[in-house]
From Swiss-Prot:
Family, similarity comment: Belongs to the TRAFAC class translation factor GTPase superfamily. Classic translation factor GTPase family. LepA subfamily.
Protein's name in the database: Elongation factor 4
Catalytic reaction annotation: GTP + H2O = GDP + phosphate + H(+)
Binding site for GTP: 22-27, 139-142
Gene: lepA
HAMAP family named among the record's database cross-references: LepA
The keyword Metal-binding is assigned to this record: no
Class of this enzyme: hydrolase
Membrane topology term: Peripheral membrane protein
Organism (species): Chelativorans sp. (strain BNC1)
InterPro entries with a match to the protein in the record: EF-4 (IPR006297), EFG_III/V (IPR035647), EFG_V-like (IPR000640), EFTu-like_2 (IPR004161), G_TR_CS (IPR031157), LepA_C_sf (IPR038363), LepA_CTD (IPR013842), LepA_IV (IPR035654)
Length: 605
């Protein structure tokens, strides 16, 4: 049983690790856990804190995780270190923001061979906004390509942090990790003095669903003491719950009697779903409530929407159960039912960004064994109607009659791109092609930092992939939503055999409608098999056709049985065939194979 709750507040350290993807923060967390003996050797595995298989395989952290480490420092004191591991990817920025709000300080991990990247910047600025004390750590110094001095200079130039006493380490081999532990104790501040006798005030940092214990809530105690058996109240929702268990993560769950000021731990109460626990809410005791709630976080707003449909209509109920379960664990993922003429029943789902979308899709296929079709991702548009109302549009198929629309506004983002300067030309061209507006360009050594305003609609498809291919994988990219701006947007419908296919309709900028329409028609021409009659494939804006391709008909050689003889006989047979084809075209249904949908929707450009 860990030594509990009697730790003096001056011996507690709450810290987060911030870094760009792949700079080694989960590996450093593994080493810290190993060196403080929180897990026995046999329980250690790579990336202990990345609990989902998908996190381990992709080598990314998605959910923020927490662990309590006990450390006997060189000064003879016994310390409790609460580490919160944060995701590095831009889609999970809100996971980072709430992790940082629960701590007083951060370790900034920078790869000594790669240097500062765009997400390093974004996360460090968040840490600075939270008034964090930051200790820079240079990881991977054992690599032949490591240039610690250059990277130190870069940290000072780009971020403006003093890196003269940055700690050189190799998280993989464990070199220098003991210095990190000492720096945490010596250079990072303890939590602000809390009052143990005051009414309970705790920040709800995170919550997730466990099949046995129900919802587990991660809390950071500010004032007061949280004990088993107390009745607590969520100040945001007003819901009351009796506390069943109190514990800490070491990363295993260890039950304790109580948690005091400055500590981070978890509670379980009979809470049925994660949606009942709002992240950033204040938890207090029901009988003796605290006067003021803590300033909360703004809830994560879904930014990208797409339809998810089962390939086999019989799997719809399984899909319903699966999205419900994912929602239990991920409150930022939203969904509602929708139907499509082409694809049947499914769900319209909202995500924080493209990586989030990809991961949810992958989890549905993997954990729940479902075959899915995803429609083209779209963003949330605002329609200002002529009668003065404003409506939000999540699905292009639901767009109101163009006559009723006064203007359409689309979301814009502020993107920060860091790239080696030899790729700058290609990236500038990419941003301009995507209707970007340059806001800033500066240099730090041989790297350029570009700031662009871009419409989110242009980034959603394949911007990231294109950026990586232009820069040979060296550019990094980070963005946040800024505002909505009016845009000359039109709804492009795809017609197959004069029938609109709702799953393929999309909102595009007028200047790009023709290019996108032509590309889509060409793609469908390759994908839809020939029928017995001619099939036109058209892209249209309203009633105006902007692109067309035709799939020619399969035809039987009806004149094969005529040997010589009169030409009018042949003509009669051909005329008869022509009539039949005409009739067939009128009544024939075009079967669009599922594969064609999947391929056509993958098309970014």
């Amino acid at each position: 049983m860990p030594r509990m709750t009697n730790t003096p507040i001056k011996n507690i350290r709450n810290f987060a690790i911030v870094a760009h993807i792949d700079h080694g923060k989960s590996t450093l967390a593994d080493r810290l856990i190993q060196m403080t003996g929180s897990l026995e050797e046999r329980e250690m595995k790579e990336q202990v804190l990345d609990s989902m298989d998908i996190e381990r395989e992709r080598g990314i952290t998605i959910k923020a995780n927490t662990v309590r480490l006990e450390y006997d420092a060189r000064d003879g004191e016994h310390y409790v270190l609460n580490l919160i591991d944060t995701p590095g990817h831009v889609d999970f920025a809100y996971e980072v923001s709430r992790s940082l709000a629960a701590c007083e300080s951060s370790l900034l991990v920078v790869d000594a061979s790669q240097g500062v990247e765009a997400q390093t910047l974004a996360n460090v600025y968040q840490a600075i906004d939270n008034n964090h004390e930051i200790v820079p750590v240079l990881n991977k110094v054992d690599l032949p390509a490591a240039e610690p001095e250059r990277v130190k200079a870069q940290i000072e130039d780009v971020i403006g942090l003093d890196a003269s006493d940055a700690i050189p380490i190799s998280a993989k081999t464990g070199v220098g990790v003991d210095e990190v532990l000492e720096a945490i104790v010596m250079r990072l501040p303890p939590p602000h003095e809390g009052d143990a006798s005051a009414p309970l005030k705790a920040l709800l940092v995170d919550s997730w669903y466990d099949a046995y214990l129900g919802v587990i809530v991660l809390v950071r105690i500010i004032d007061g003491v949280l004990k088993k058996g107390q009745t607590v109240r969520m100040m945001g929702t007003g819901a009351r719950y009796p506390v069943d268990r109190v514990g800490v993560m070491t990363p295993k769950m260890v039950m304790v009697e109580s948690l005091g000021p400055g500590e981070i731990g978890f509670i379980t109460a009979s809470i049925k779903e994660v949606a009942d626990t709002r992240v950033g809410d204040t938890i207090t005791e029901d009988k003796r409530a605290t006067a003021a709630a803590l300033p909360g976080f703004k809830p994560a707003q879904p930014v990208v929407f797409c339809g998810l449909f089962p390939v086999d209509a019989a799997d719809f109920e399984d899909l319903r159960a699966a999205v419900g379960k994912l929602r239990l664990n991920d409150a930022s993922f939203s969904y509602e039912m929708e139907t499509s003429a082409a694809l049947g029943f499914g769900f319209r789902c909202g995500f924080l960004g493209l990586l989030h979308l990809e991961i949810i899709q992958e989890r549905l296929t993997r954990e729940f064994d479902l075959d899915l079709i995803a429609t083209a991702p779209s963003v949330v548009y605002r329609m200002n109607l002529t009668d003065g109302k404003t409506v939000e549009l999540h699905n292009p198929a639901d767009m109101p009659d163009p006559v009723k629309i006064a203007e359409i506004e689309e979301p814009w983002i502020r993107a920060t791109i860091l790239t080696p300067d030899e790729h700058l030309g290609g990236i500038l061209k990419l941003c301009q092609d995507r209707r970007g507006v340059q806001a800033d360009l500066s240099y730090a050594g041989s790297r350029a930092m570009l700031v662009y305003d871009l419409p989110l609609n242009e980034v959603v498809f394949d911007f990231y992939d294109r950026l990586k291919s232009i820069s040979r994988g060296y550019a990094s990219f980070d963005y946040h939503l800024t505002d909505y701006r009016e845009g000359d947007l039109v709804k492009m419908s795809i017609l197959v055999n004069d029938e609109p296919v709702d799953a393929l309709s999309m909102l595009v900028h007028r200047s790009q409608a023709e290019r996108r329409g032509r590309a889509m028609c060409e793609k469908l021409k390759e994908l839809i098999p020939q029928h017995m009659f001619k099939i036109p494939i058209q892209a249209a804006i309203g009633g105006r056709i902007i692109a067309r391709e035709t799939i020619s008909a399969l035809r039987k050689d009806v004149t094969a049985k005529c040997y010589g003889g009169d030409v009018t006989r042949k003509r009669k047979l051909l005329e008869k065939q022509k009539e039949g084809k005409k009739k067939m075209r009128q009544f024939g249904k075009v079967e669009i194979p599922q594969e064609a949908f999947i391929q056509a929707l993958k098309m970014g450009d």
